[in-house]
Amino acid sequence: MTSVSWIQKGTHIAIGTGKGLVQIWDAERTRRLRTMTGHTARVGSLAWNTHILTSGSRDRLIYHRDVRAPDQWLRKLVGHKQEVCGLKWNCEDGQLASGGNDNKLMVWDKLSETPLWKFSDHTAAVKAIAWSPHQRGLLASGGGTADRRIIFHDTVRGAVINEVDTGSQVCNIAWSKNSNEIVSTHGYSQNQIVVWKYPSMTQVVSLTGHTYRVLYLAMSPDGRVVVTGAGDETLRFWNVFGKRPGAREDSDGGGRLSDWGVIR
């Protein structure tokens, strides 16, 4: 198993394998529904846009798959010169961002087989990708150890609008749903989690605790808690963001992550 991604609504989960296969499972019934072919090497990235499942592989290809149809794939995208290591859909605008080990970031419009934009600003692999939920066409990407930057792109105009040197490998990026802030996880040399204020990119807080690079990042549905996973074989939960303005507090009893208190 080399990648996992939940469908936005429902109980289906997609799994990429080291043999180039993409499997769809019903998590509720723990039953495999289908296996899709096409790739010839490991599938390291997956992204959903409703019923469209997109997969990226070490074979440098990207496939769009309509999981409702019997066909193995719907579109094949050729653009990256090395492994595709990051994929992220902007479901509202129908744009797909892809990052590769070739240091390239590409933006594809809907199901087009030709990239809308090609960005060559990074100097290391681009695995970390995130679309802003607050501003149309605002895309953040993070570079690897030889780059260390988070770069912000305007995909309406095809321009770079901002960047910050984080000082270490950028492994993941996620925007806060509740405020105009962004959280990033890092590898060598500090293995930290950082919350930034956008657009000033001033650090709100830097969190340490992991002893190896922080490879995984996920956010709770309410946008308040993030969980990180690292090569030190630990999961850590961080209550980093406040509630959405106007949202009511959950009135359930104890045991919630929010009971642990925010970190700022």
Residue ranges of each PLM-predicted region?
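WD40/WD-repeat beta-propeller blade-loop signature
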Residues: 9, 32, 42, 49-52, ...
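Conserved strand-to-loop turn within each blade of WD40 beta-propeller repeats
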Residues: 16-19, 56-59, 92, 98-102, ...
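A conserved positional marker within WD40/Gbeta-like beta-propeller blades
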Residues: 12, 21, 40, 61-63, ...
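WD40/WD-repeat beta-propeller blade N-cap
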Residues: 1, 36-43, 77-84, 120-126, ...
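Loop/turn segments within WD40 beta-propeller blades
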Residues: 5-10, 16, 45-52, 87-94, ...
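WD40-repeat beta-propellers
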Residues: 22-26, 46, 62-67, 87, ...
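Terminal intrinsically disordered, low-complexity extensions flanking WD-repeat/beta-propeller proteins
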Residues: 167-169, 180, 189-192, 199-264
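WD40 beta-propeller blade-start loop/N-cap
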Residues: 5, 28, 35-38, 48, ...
